[in-house]
Amino acid sequence: MKRIITTLAAALIATAAVSAQGLETAYYLDGYTFGYRLNPSFMSERGFFALPGVSRLSIGAGYTPGLENILFVKDGKTVTFLNSNVTKEEFTSKMKGSDLKVHLTPDINILALGFWNGDAFHTFDVSLKANMAGASPYDLFRLLKCGTEASDVFDLSSNRVHGSAYLEAAFSSAFDVGDNLSIGYRIKGLAGLQYIDLNLSKMDLNLGREKWEIAASGDMFVSGDFLKVPGKYDEELGKRVVDVENIEPTSDFDIHRFRPAGYGGAVDIGATWRPFDFLSVSGAVLDLGGISWKTTAYAQTPDMAYTYTPAEDMSFETASESISDQITNATSALSSMLYMEMKEENGKGQFKMLPWSANVGVNLRAPFYDRISLGLLGVHRHGPAFNYNSARASLNWSLFKWFSISGSVAKDNLKTTSYGGAINFHPGLLNIFLGFDSIPTTVIPVKAIDDALADLPFKIPFAVGIPKSRFNTGIFFGVTLSMGQRHRDFAGRRYVKKVETESLPSLEPMEMIVPEGEEVKNSEPLTTPTSPDTNY
C-alpha cells in the first residue's frame, strides 16, 4: 500500500502540469471532431477516421490546495511539509484549514470512426479510461505535522481514495428533428479492468499518552487481478484484517489468463436547440450507468471503537530530503492504525456507478459576423471522492473555414480561476486540434521535483515545471483524417452548397395547328428547370 500511495502521489504531481476536469474549452470550438463526446447531439462537419495512438489523448486532473502549501524549498532542496526543517507554524499558516482534493482522469482513444448516413451522423469508438481521485480532511495533515501538540482529538472523517480503469466501446447517433432541433445519444459497453475504493466516512481519534482510541466507519472494495490484497490475523481483535501496508501490484500477473473484472453499460444523451440562426442552447448528461464488478476483496471497519498503541519513537516527521521517503513514512504510520476486517465475499458482484456529468451551454454568434461567437458553459461532475462545478465563458473565432481558435475563463468550486485556449486546424484531409482548460502562471521547476523523486522509476516529461498554486486543468490533443462530403458548416449548421444556374432564353409564343374537328386540350405550362439547394 505504501508503494501504491507513494507512486500515485508522485504521479499526481507529475501529471498536474497538463491536466482538468474534462475538455470544457473545446465545447464551442468550431470544427472540433470529438464534440460528440461533450454533447452527443453535436455533429461533425464531415466523416472522420481517427488514427490509432494519436487520434485523441485527454488528461484531466487537478488539486486543491496548491502544491505551494505542501511542497517547500529548504536548503535548496524541494521537500514536503513532513520534513523536519519545515516548522509547524509555517505549514499551518499556508494550509489555512483547507481539505485536500486531487483527481486524475486519463482518456486514451484507441480507435474512432465517424460517418454520415443520410441526414444522421454516427460514430463508433474504443477508449481506455481511468478515474483516480482522493479527498482528505485538514485534520489529517494537522495530525501528521503537529501530532499531539495540536490537539487530543482529530476528526479524520471523509477520507476517500478511489481508482478505476476500464475499456469503453461506444456507438452514437445524432440527427435533426425539424429545422432547429438536434438530438443525439451514445450507447456504451464497458469492460472493467481494475477497481479500488477505500472510503472512511467516519474516523475520530482520541489521543491518550499511552493509547489512542479510534472510532471508524468505512469499507474497502477491490476488484481486478492487477492488485494483491493480503490478509493477516489480528490477535487483539480476534479477526482477520487487511494487511494494508502490503497491498501492492500483482507480481505474477499472467496476461494469457486475464479476464475482465466486470461488465456494464452507460448512455449519453444530448440536445441542441437553435431558436434563431445566431443563437443555440444545448445540454447533455454523460456516463449514466456503471459496471458490475466481481469482488476480489472486501473489508469493513470494526463495529466497535478500538484502541491503538503507538510506538514510543513514532513520528510522522522525517529529516529525509526524499519526497517518496516522506510519503512512505507517513503512510506506514497511518496504515498501522487502520483496521479493516476481511469479509468472505469473493466472486460476488457489486454494481458501481460511473462518475457522471452534465453540461449546459448557450452560444451567441455575432449577427454582423457569424465567425465570432460567445459561449457560456455550466458543468457539474459527480465524482467518486468529491463533486465539481464550474462556469466557463469562451470567445470563439473561425478565422477561416479550416482554422478556429477559442479562449476561455472559468471559475469552479475548487476555488480556482482558470484561463484556457484551443486551436483547430482542419484543411481538407487532416484535422489537428490542441488545447488546455487552464494555463499555469507560476510553476515549480521540474529539476527540483525530479531530484526529490530520484528513486522512482520515471521522470517528469515536461520541460518547464508543474503548477505551484491550486490547479484544475486539462489537455487534449489529436489528429484525425476527414472523409466524405461536407454536411455541416463551421458553426454546426446544415451545409448548403450554392449551385449557380444559367437562365434559359425566353420562348416566343408558337402558333399551333390543330386538325379540323379536334379540340385543343389544356396542358401544363412549361417551367424552367432549376437546381435546388443540395445538402452536402
Walk through the language-model features, giving the residues of each.
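N-terminal secretory signal peptides that target proteins for export/translocation
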Residues: M1-K2
